[in-house]
């Protein structure tokens, strides 16, 4: 228990230093990461990629089922987060960007897009400052990200927040 507490404290210091986020303890003993949506997403990006390298079984047995369960619980149409559809979308991005994604990258991107979809559905979107916005808009990946946004918007009949394609450009860069 002491070792776990030390690990949690060290993780809290690390995410504060690298991601400007704080780890807070709830009344029930649970933990919550607090900070901007952009910083939270970048933190998840970092740790999820790390998780794929260090303990892929945890991602497969814990993270993925919890994410899919939440997508289902929120009533999001299955065709949005279906693995086959998302893999096709990632493969389309790969062709448009002329980038080859390894199978682990495809798995990561599909999971991450599911997470973004969950946040989008909840009305949670990252905010970019003008400098970050200009950088993201200048990337080739931004055009592809806009295409993903149009794809989601056509099927969901719900507008995509303007900063969501900026984040997807960052995700694919």
What is the meaning of each model-derived region?
Residues 1-173:
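A cross-family "folded-core" feature that marks the main globular domain of proteins
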């Amino acid at each position: 228990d002491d070792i776990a507490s030390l690990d949690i404290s060290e993780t809290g210091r690390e995410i504060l230093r690298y991601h400007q986020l704080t780890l807070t303890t709830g009344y029930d003993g649970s933990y919550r990461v607090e900070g901007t949506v952009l910083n939270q997403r970048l933190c998840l990006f970092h740790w999820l990629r790390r998780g794929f390298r260090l303990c892929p079984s945890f991602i497969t047995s814990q993270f993925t089922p919890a994410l899919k369960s939440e997508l289902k619980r929120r009533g999001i149409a299955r065709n949005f987060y279906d693995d086959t559809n998302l893999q096709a979308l990632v493969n389309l991005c790969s062709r448009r960007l002329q980038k080859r994604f390894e199978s682990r990258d495809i798995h990561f991107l599909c999971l991450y897009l599911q997470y973004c979809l969950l946040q989008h559905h909840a009305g949670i979107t990252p905010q970019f400052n003008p400098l970050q916005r200009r950088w993201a808009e200048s990337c080739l990946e931004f055009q592809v990200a806009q295409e993903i946004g149009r794809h989601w918007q056509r099927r969901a009949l719900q507008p995509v927040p303007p900063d969501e394609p900026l984040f997807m450009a960052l995700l694919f860069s």
